[in-house]
Amino acid sequence: MSLHQERKSELVSKFRTHESDTGSPEVQVALLSERITMLTEHFKTHKKDHHSRRGLLKLVGQRRRLLDYLKSKDVARYKKLIDGLGIRK
């Protein structure tokens, strides 16, 4: 499952830090969160798809590492990102 190009560019433009930014932690976390959401919806109908579930767990771990990195570097950017994505309480 991949993101559609329109949705991907929409996320990049929303979370980028400067005009040509496509690889900052904010953008990467936003793209990973969208893929995680898509896979979560997939598992509501395909409960026994354990192969894809492993991929989901890898994505969640990668997002966690990026969030930890961002939190250690700049707490304000971290808080803005999690508020924008709605992924923490």
Swiss-Prot record:
One of the primary rRNA binding proteins, it binds directly to 16S rRNA where it helps nucleate assembly of the platform of the 30S subunit by binding and bridging several RNA helices of the 16S rRNA. One of its GO terms (biological process) is translation. CDD domains: Ribosomal_S15p_S13e. Part of the 30S ribosomal subunit. Forms a bridge to the 50S subunit in the 70S ribosome, contacting the 23S rRNA. One of its GO terms (molecular function) is rRNA binding. Belongs to the universal ribosomal protein uS15 family. It holds the Pfam family Ribosomal_S15. Residues 1-21 have a biased composition (Basic and acidic residues). InterPro entries: Ribosomal_uS15 (IPR000589), Ribosomal_uS15_bac-type (IPR005290), uS15_NS1_RNA-bd_sf (IPR009068). This is Small ribosomal subunit protein uS15. Gene3D superfamilies: 6.10.250.3130, S15/NS1, RNA-binding. One of its GO terms (cellular component) is cytosolic small ribosomal subunit. It comes from the Bacteria. PROSITE patterns: RIBOSOMAL_S15. The gene is rpsO. Residues 1-25 are annotated as: Disordered. Keywords: Ribonucleoprotein, Ribosomal protein, RNA-binding, rRNA-binding. HAMAP family: Ribosomal_uS15_B.
